[in-house]
Amino acid sequence: MTPMGALADDPAWAAAFLQRMTRMVARDFNHPSIIVWSLGNESGYGAAHEAMYHWTKRADPSRPIQYEGGGSATSATDIICPMYARTDTDMPQGPDLAPKPGLIKWAGLGGENRPIILCEYAHAMGNSLGNFSDYWDAFRKYPRLQGGFIWDWVDQGLNKTDEHGRTVWAYGGDFGDEKNDRQFCINGLVFPDRSPHPTLLEAKRCQQPFTAKLRSRDEISVTVTSEYLFRATANERLHWQYLDEKRVIDSGDVALDLLPGEVSSVPLFPKDLQQRAASWLNVWITQVESTDWSEPGHEVA
């Protein structure tokens, strides 16, 4: 079998590799939305990648470079960027390859301080994202684990009427094509029309910028943590409901006043705190005013 990096080590292909990189950097250099350069995807590792890396670092020392090929941690990447690594266990990769370390183990390996960002993870096909919270627990606990890119955002399907007259999303094989990608076109967080899958709610819950934990049952106060990095909570309100198995006993809302990264105790003062067999506290946070991307009342956590 030809090694995946065969072309990257073939001098005949060196100019093609470099041209692809130099043209991309020239085209996108002045776009502020570009925060990381990529050398490509799933093309092994070889001398051409090293040449692309060093040319780009000279042309633009302000941005980091990421490349997963060759084991995710070669000298041609500023970010360790594994694909589908597990959180706490190693992953076998075949008889001739060393196991891919679990993320927590990877973060503790000596002699290395590059950030770890999964270039792909949480393959969002079908009834997926069941262990998504495990990743985000690890991201929050270990500073070198800095997130990842979900594969992927949107289903690749086309609107089609089936033999029963129903409108369906068509994909691999639905157009009489015998060689196709089957259901691997349908692995996003949203449908082709951008309406959400249930998995989008799971992603939102794990990635929300606030956490709230019950601090005291006696007085019903919660500890709220803001994960905003740059701004205070000037546009957020915390809403709450105190209820038992039969009814909502009390409810209210309070303005949040947190600096970036601040942790604060928020007393809620519900009425009627008599002892009950079971009671619950629901807490959610909304935005008061509209933003460039949300309407008033949008729930952020």
Describe the role of every protein-language-model region.
Residues 1-185:
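Substrate-binding/catalytic cleft of secreted carbohydrate-active enzymes
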Residues 138-301:
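Carbohydrate-binding surfaces of carbohydrate-active enzymes
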